[in-house]
C-alpha cells in the first residue's frame, strides 16, 4: 500500500474515532491527511465508501493478526480456544474503531465482512485443525470450530466472556467436549408450516409482497397495495417505511410460521436429541426452500447477514432463544435449555447463510449425521452444566 493510501486510511481512522462513521467525509479525511481531494479520489476512486471499506479491512486484518500472535505458541486446543476467545472479545470491546462501529451501526462492517469472512474462516479453520487428532472428519471439525469461534466473537449470546469459568465451560461443552456421546440419533422429518392466513392486514400485505417479490415484480408500494387490495395510506399506516421495511415485516411473519412448525415438533419430540435434530431439520428445510427467503438471500443477502452479526445478532439470539428454550425445559433445567436453544440457533444460522459441502441442510439424514458428529456430545455437556443462577440464588440465601 502506498504512503498516500496509508496516510488517508490513518486520517479516516482519526475521523471515525472523533465523529463516527456517518459524519466522516472525504473533505475532512483529505484535510486531516494533508492531501488534496484529487489525491484521495486517485487513490480511492469510490470516494468515501472505498475509504471506509479500505480502512475497516485494514483494521480487521490487524485485529486477527494480533489475535494469531497472541495464541500461536499455545500447546493445546483448549488453551487456544479459551485464551483466544477471551482475548479477542476483550479486544473488540476496547478497540477504538470496531467498538464505534458496533455502537453506531454495525451495518458499516457488513461490506468488509462479506468480502473477508470466507478467508478469515478458512485461516482460523486451518490453524485449529492443526491441533486436532487425525480422523475422517478432521477438516470438517476445524471448519465447525472456526465458524463457532467467529460467531461468539460477533455475538457472545448468554455467555459472559469476562468470566474465565464461563469461557472454559463454553469451550468444554460446545466446542471440545471431553467425552464423545457415542449416540446415533436418527433423522427427523421436517414439520410443515402452518397454513398462511389472510385474516389481518399485516398477513394480507405479507402475502401480497411475497407474490410480488418472488415473481420479480417492481416491489413498489403501489403494486403491493394493489395486490393486497388496500390503499397506499392504509399500507403506510400498517407498516410505516419503504419497501424494505415491508420485506422486514414479511420476514418476521414467515419466521413466526417457521417457529410455529418448530414448536409443533418440540411438543412431539421424545428426547432432547430428537428435539434439537428436529428443530434444525425443520428450520433449515424451510429457510432453504421458502421462496421469499431464498430470493431475499439471493438479491439482498446483506439484509440477512447484518441481522446475524454483532449487536443485532445478540438481540435476535435473545428473542429466538426466549421462544425456543421453554419447550426444551422438560428435559433440562432452565439455564441449560437456554444454552442448548441458543447454540442450536447459532449453528443453524451459520450453515444456512454459509453452506458447507459436508452438510445438506435440506436432507434430514445429512442433518442427523451432522448432529451426531458435531453436536450430540456438546448437547450432553450443556445439559450437565450446573445452573449458575440457581447456585447463586442458593448461596445468596445462605449469606
Where are these regions (language model features)?
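N-terminal intrinsically disordered/low-complexity leader segments
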Residues: 1-3, 107, 159, 169-200, ...
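Amphipathic C-terminal alpha-helical segment
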Residues: 90-94, 130, 145-162, 173-182, ...
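Alpha-helical structural segments
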Residues: 3, 7-14, 18, 32, ...
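Short coil turns linking two alpha-helices in DNA-binding domains
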Residues: 4, 36-37, 231-232
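Amphipathic alpha-helical segments used for helix-helix packing
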Residues: 89-115, 286-313
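Amphipathic alpha-helical packing segments from all-alpha helical-bundle domains
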Residues: 64, 108-143, 304-342
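HTH DNA-binding helix-turn interface
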Residues: 18-21, 41-52, 213-218, 236-247
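Append "Primarily bacterial transcriptional regulators
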Residues: 28-32, 40, 223-227, 235
Amino acid at each position: 500500500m502506498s504512503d498516500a493510501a496509508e496516510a488517508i486510511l490513518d486520517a479516516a481512522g482519526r475521523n471515525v474515532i472523533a465523529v463516527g462513521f456517518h459524519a466522516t467525509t472525504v473533505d475532512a479525511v483529505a484535510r486531516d491527511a494533508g492531501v488534496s481531494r484529487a489525491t484521495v479520489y486517485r487513490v480511492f476512486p469510490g470516494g468515501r465508501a472505498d475509504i471506509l471499506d479500505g480502512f475497516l479491512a485494514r483494521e480487521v486484518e490487524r485485529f486477527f493478526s494480533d489475535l494469531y500472535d497472541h495464541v500461536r505458541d499455545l500447546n493445546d486446543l483448549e488453551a487456544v480456544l479459551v485464551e483466544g476467545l477471551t482475548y479477542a472479545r476483550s479486544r473488540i470491546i476496547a478497540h477504538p474503531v470496531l467498538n464505534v462501529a458496533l455502537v453506531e451501526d454495525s451495518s458499516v462492517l457488513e461490506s468488509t465482512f462479506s468480502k473477508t469472512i470466507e478467508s478469515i474462516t478458512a485461516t482460523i479453520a486451518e490453524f485449529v485443525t492443526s491441533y486436532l487428532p487425525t480422523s475422517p472428519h478432521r477438516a470438517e471439525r476445524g471448519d465447525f470450530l472456526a465458524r463457532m469461534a467467529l460467531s461468539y466473537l460477533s455475538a457472545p449470546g448468554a455467555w459472559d466472556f469476562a468470566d474465565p469459568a464461563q469461557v472454559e465451560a463454553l469451550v468444554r461443552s460446545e466446542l471440545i467436549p471431553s467425552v464423545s456421546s457415542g449416540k446415533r440419533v436418527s433423522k427427523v422429518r421436517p414439520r410443515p408450516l402452518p397454513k398462511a392466513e389472510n385474516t389481518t392486514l399485516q398477513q394480507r400485505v405479507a402475502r401480497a409482497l411475497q407474490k410480488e417479490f418472488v415473481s420479480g415484480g417492481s416491489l413498489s408500494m403501489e403494486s403491493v397495495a394493489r395486490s393486497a387490495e388496500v390503499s397506499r395510506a392504509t399500507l403506510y399506516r400498517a407498516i410505516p417505511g419503504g419497501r424494505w421495511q415491508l420485506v422486514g415485516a414479511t420476514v418476521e411473519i414467515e419466521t413466526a410460521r417457521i417457529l410455529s412448525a418448530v414448536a409443533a415438533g418440540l411438543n412431539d419430540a421424545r428426547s432432547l436429541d430428537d428435539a434439537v435434530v428436529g428443530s434444525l431439520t425443520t428450520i433449515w428445510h424451510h429457510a432453504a426452500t421458502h421462496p421469499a427467503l431464498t430470493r431475499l438471500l439471493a438479491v439482498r443477502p446483506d439484509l440477512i447477514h447484518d441481522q446475524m452479526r454483532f449487536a443485532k445478532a445478540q438481540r435476535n439470539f435473545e428473542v429466538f432463544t426466549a421462544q425456543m428454550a421453554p419447550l426444551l425445559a422438560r428435559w433440562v433445567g432452565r439455564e441449560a435449555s437456554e444454552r442448548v436453544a441458543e447454540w442450536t440457533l447459532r449453528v443453524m444460522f451459520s450453515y444456512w447463510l454459509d453452506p458447507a459441502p459436508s452438510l445438506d441442510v435440506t436432507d434430514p439424514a445429512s442433518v442427523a449425521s451432522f448432529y451426531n458428529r458435531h453436536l450430540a456430545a456438546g448437547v450432553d455437556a450443556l445439559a450437565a452444566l450446573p445452573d449458575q443462577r440457581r447456585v447463586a440464588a442458593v448461596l445468596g440465601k445462605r449469606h
